[in-house]
A protein has these predicted regions:
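Acidic, negatively charged sequence tracts
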Residues: 1-191
Length: 191
């Protein structure tokens, strides 16, 4: 699990002023915290964090003398310049189940001969913090046209420690035949 150092937010400055100085306003809430904590993170660290991790990823925040285990709950970017506006972290209680999402990463997409339809690339689930899944990898090498992969086909989601918030027969992806090839086959059959 990654660890990142954060500092308490300067309450005298508004969020807009912080962003101009290259600082991203953040917030930690939930878990065993009595109140939410306003924190700040420099922009370079925030960019690096969101490049490496995703929403739902577990991360340790080092704030002064304490370490808080959290997950990235939300973030927003400015539409105009694509800079991070804020990041929200949810503190995790080790004994309480938490809602999160697992991201599906596809490998060997170059080997797919048909059209790859990605239908459900974020799988919502609930689990204890120790059982959280950040990403699952699906290898597409050797998968023929007509292949359908459901949530139940991914072994990580069959664990008793995970409560899926979608049906196991929900389609994650399918490999369809290319439309041009189907049209040509129909024309050849007609001749």
């Amino acid at each position: 699990m990654d660890t990142i150092t954060v500092e308490k937010r300067n309450e005298q400055l508004k969020a807009k002023q912080l962003r101009r100085k290259g600082i991203v306003p953040c917030c930690i809430f939930g878990g065993s915290l009595p109140n939410s904590i306003s924190i700040q993170l420099d922009e370079k660290s925030a960019e690096k964090l969101l490049r490496k991790l995703r929403l739902g990823s577990k991360i340790q925040l080092k704030l002064e003398d304490q370490t808080i285990i959290t997950q990235i709950k939300d973030s927003r970017r400015c539409f105009a310049d694509n800079k991070i506006e804020y990041i929200d972290f949810q503190a995790l209680n080790p004994k309480t189940k938490v809602n999160s999402v697992a991201h599906v990463i596809l490998e060997n997409t170059d080997y797919v001969t048909g059209v790859l339809d990605k239908l459900l690339m974020e799988i919502p689930y609930a689990s204890l913090p120790e059982d959280m899944i950040d990403t699952v990898t699906v290898d597409l090498e050797g998968k023929p046209v007509g292949t359908i992969i459901t949530v139940g086909d991914i072994p990580e989601f069959l664990s008793d420690h995970i409560d899926l918030q979608v049906e196991t027969d929900s389609i994650v992806l399918r490999i369809a035949e290319k439309r041009n090839a189907a049209a040509q086959d129909t024309e050849q059959a007609a001749e």
